[in-house]
Structure formats: C-alpha cells, structure tokens
C-alpha cells in the first residue's frame, strides 16, 4: 500500500472535540439487525497515535515535535507528521476506486449510523489467515436479521490484542503478512448487495495478510463503501443494537486519514 504523508499543526488546538451525540442517519429504514440508539455509554474503538505503532512497511509513519511549552510560552503545542493510512484510520473509496469519494466527501450520515458486529475471533484464533465468508454473513443474518443499507459493519477478530507488539501484529513470515480479513465475495456482498456504508476491522486491512492484490478493497470501494482499519475493542461489542460514530481528519481530496471511532451502546450492555 502506498505511503501518503500529511503534516498538521497541533498548536493550541485543545483536547475538546465536538460530541456527535444524537444524530443517527437512516433511522427510519432500520431493521432489527441495525436498530440505532441515540443515548447510552460511549466506547472508544481507536488506538492513540504514537511513534511506536505498527506500520505497513515497518518504517516510521508518525513523528511530532514540541513547538511551545507552558513554562516558556504559556501554552502547550506540537507539530506532527503522519501517513494517511496509519493507526486507526479510514480508507476513503478513492483509495482504490478511480472515481470514488475522497475522505472530505464522505457524507455525514454514512459516518454516524447504526452498526453491527460480526465476531470471528474464534475462527481467527484457530487460523491466523481466516477470512470472513459469505456464509458467515448469512449465518449472522439468520440469527440477527438482514443487514440494511447504510449500516456500518464491524468485523471482530481479536487481532488488536497484538497491537503493543508491532512484529506480532503485522506477523510477517517469509515475506508475507498473516492476519485475518474478508474474502472478496464477503466484501462484495456487504458493499454491493447490502449497500453498507462501511466495513471496519481490528487488523491492518480488511484484506487478509497474505493478499497481494487487495481483492476485498477492489470488491467494495467501487461500490462506495469506506473502510475502518486498525480498530480496537470490537470483540466486546454486541452483535446489534448500537451506533458507531466515525470522525476522520477531513483532508481535502485525501485518500483517507487517522480517525476517532466510537460505539454508542445501551446502558444495559
């Protein structure tokens, strides 16, 4: 995957991002599998950015420099440089589709929406190259209802437990990475047939590690689906009954960018 770097100023921005608390897109056409909620507890599904995080090619992708301190300047600020596709991030459709939407053109109602979580952690524990299949999705729908258009679909593999150790997370052996993902058929079913807004996963890519052609990317991005990669905490989510909020950096004409991701869960869960 190509390395795309952005540089941003973080001087005196402060820590308070605006809360997207109650706007839920597509509520009126939800099914039991994708029933949104508008209040409850909020769970963070993203990693904090740091210089030691795993990277696709093993090379540094994030750096920062302090430019102001409270002792010297009366306020604290930094500059930082990062790749678009680093840490918990969004792949906009334009990343693999020539006419796809760039990250700044992702519609807000596709970033805040009812979600489902398909858990394949048991399969991934047995097979590090396991891929979510069409049959897995159909079994999920048989149990929880059909996935409706606009849904954010998260795939929980448990791979994020390896995040603190970049070598184990990227899991490269004999020149090939090994981690779970989706088959191209499963990605196409979600993006083309179910018309989901997004596919998210707790690994470095929705394609499994050994992929060299990124078949799942090519099967889903021309259909308008964006991806969330390097998420965390997905195995703790329920299959249905929650909302996801995705807030990527809004880079003009960008192919993606680091993102905050939150799940809004009912208080009882």
Q: Which stretches of residues belong to each language-model region?
A:
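Bacterial N-terminal signal peptides that target proteins for export
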Residues: 2-13
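A detector of low-complexity, intrinsically disordered, Ser/Thr/Gly/Pro/Ala-rich segments
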Residues: 2-4, 20, 29-32
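Active-/binding-site microenvironments in catalytic and ligand-binding cores
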Residues: 27-269
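Residues marking helix boundaries in flexible regions
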Residues: 5-7, 25, 38
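Bacterial N-terminal signal peptides
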Residues: 11-23
């Amino acid at each position: 995957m190509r390395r795309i770097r952005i540089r941003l100023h973080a001087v005196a921005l402060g820590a308070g991002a605006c809360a997207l608390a109650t706007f839920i897109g597509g509520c009126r056409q939800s099914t039991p599998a994708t029933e949104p909620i508008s209040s409850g507890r909020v769970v963070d599904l993203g990693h904090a950015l740091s210089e030691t995080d795993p990277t696709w090619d093993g090379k540094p992708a994030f750096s920062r420099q302090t430019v102001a301190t409270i002792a010297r300047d009366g306020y604290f600020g930094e500059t930082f440089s990062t790749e678009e596709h680093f840490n918990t991030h969004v792949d906009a459709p334009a990343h693999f589709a020539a006419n796809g939407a760039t990250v700044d053109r992702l519609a807000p109602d596709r970033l805040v929406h009812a979600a489902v979580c398909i858990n394949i952690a048991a399969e991934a524990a047995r097979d590090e190259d396991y891929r979510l299949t069409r049959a897995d999705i159909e079994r999920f729908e048989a149990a929880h209802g059909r996935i409706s258009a606009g849904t954010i679909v998260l795939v929980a593999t448990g791979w994020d437990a390896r995040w603190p150790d970049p070598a184990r997370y990227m899991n490269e052996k004999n020149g090939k990475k090994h981690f779970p993902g989706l088959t191209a058929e499963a990605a196409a079913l979600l993006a083309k047939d179910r018309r989901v807004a997004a596919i998210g996963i707790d690994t470095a890519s929705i394609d499994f590690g050994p992929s060299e052609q990124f078949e799942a990317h090519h099967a889903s991005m021309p259909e308008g689906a964006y991806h969330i990669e390097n998420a965390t905490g997905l195995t703790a989510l329920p299959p249905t009954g929650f909302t996801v909020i995705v807030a990527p950096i809004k880079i003009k004409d960008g192919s993606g960018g680091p993102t905050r991701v939150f799940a809004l869960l009912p208080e009882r869960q």
